[in-house]
Amino acid sequence: MASVARLRNVVIDCPDPHALAAFYAAVAGGTLVAEEADWVVLKLPDGLRLGFQLAEGYTPPEWPRADHNSQQFHLDFDAGPTWEDVDAAEKKVLELGARLLRREEDPVAEDFRVYADPAGHPFCLCRID
């Protein structure tokens, strides 16, 4: 089936677009390709683009919830094939300002850990083998 359009950006509302773009650039790499006071675009090494848009009065989502202030989306990052890779990535994202939301005690049952970025959006570091 032919597509109607091509996805250009995944856009994330936040209180400080420049700070959140810097956080994700440190996590995933890439370069800033557009910068305005209320809008920043980060182009990742694989070509995916993340946009960060100023949202006045921004309230971070609460994870996990299913009501009006619930998570709307989240990003999954491949940290590597081993738990040691995930541990190393976890150390780095925590140093960058992320906050741990859930670390599964049974690594056989789960292959990811859940964090919040500095603006409160949930994201996961995944062990992909």
Task: List PLM regions with ranges.
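Glyoxalase I/VOC metalloenzyme domain signal
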Residues: M1-R8, I12-A34, K43-R99, A116-D129
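Short glycine/proline-centered loop/turn elements that form peptide/ligand docking sites
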Residues: E36-D38, D106
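Short, small/polar residue-rich loop motifs at catalytic or cofactor-binding pockets
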Residues: V108-E110
